[in-house]
Amino acid sequence: MAAKVKDNNMINESYREIRTYLTINDEMKTILVTSAEMNEGKTTTICNLAKCFGELDDIKVILIDCDFKKRGVSRKLGIGNPFGVSDIVFGNKKLDECIQKVEDIDVLPSGGVPNNTSMLLNSKVMKNLVNELREKYDYVFIDSPPICRLNDACIIAQYVDGTVLVNASKEIDSKVAKLTLEKLKKVGANVIGVVLNKFRSEQYNYYSYYSYYGYDDNRKGIFRRKKKKNKHR
């Protein structure tokens, strides 16, 4: 797996902390991972997060690539199968013909690029596909295009259990982050947290590649810290 990280290091431990938070709710089975803009690390995050869940005994995980144009998941994991989501929705292929096994997880590539991704993602067939996978797997992770680029993520967010945002801490503009949350809230998305990439805290004197914040809707859009990292000595 191209996105594999070394065992027992800080990055791997960060993913395990996120996994712990996400497994608190037994009904949190279908999870969208997206970002506000490009190059914030959402695809790397979702690949490693899916792998982290796949490490658990007797847990079935599937990772779905719904970023039809970029196909980031397929590229990162080295999947050459051209068939996937779009082919299933259009009735050209069956589900078991498209699923690929990558280490401990199953992967469903995006397939061919549809003329209208919004129509595909909003279709009854697509929603039924996600529901079918929800019944077959313990966890379903979905990668999508950035929210400020296409409306695709906002569509998917309406029929998954939860949405996780990935933000590059040094690059994300606060106004863009606020706009992203407003877009998701307008469609009734359940924003369950934020993964903050390449996060440095001078206050706690540590550097972390990934920090996780739960989203507290009662605090008017403020992210509250869920996990405290160990300080470097």
Feature names for model-found ranges:
Residues F141-I142, L196:
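Hydrophobic residues in beta-strands of the RecA-like P-loop NTPase core, especially within AAA+ ATPase
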Residues K178-R233:
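Hydrophobic micro-sites
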Residues A2-N12, R16, T20-E27, S35-E40, ...:
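P-loop/Walker-type NTP enzyme "switch/lid" segment
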Residues F53:
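Aromatic pocket-lining residues of Rossmann-like dinucleotide-binding sites
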Residues L32, V107-P109, F141, V164-V166:
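Structural motif
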Residues E132-E135, I147-K170:
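Inter-motif core of Ras-like GTPase G domains
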Residues F68-K70, K94, G112-N115, I147-C148, ...:
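Conserved nucleotide-binding/hydrolysis micro-motifs of P-loop NTPases
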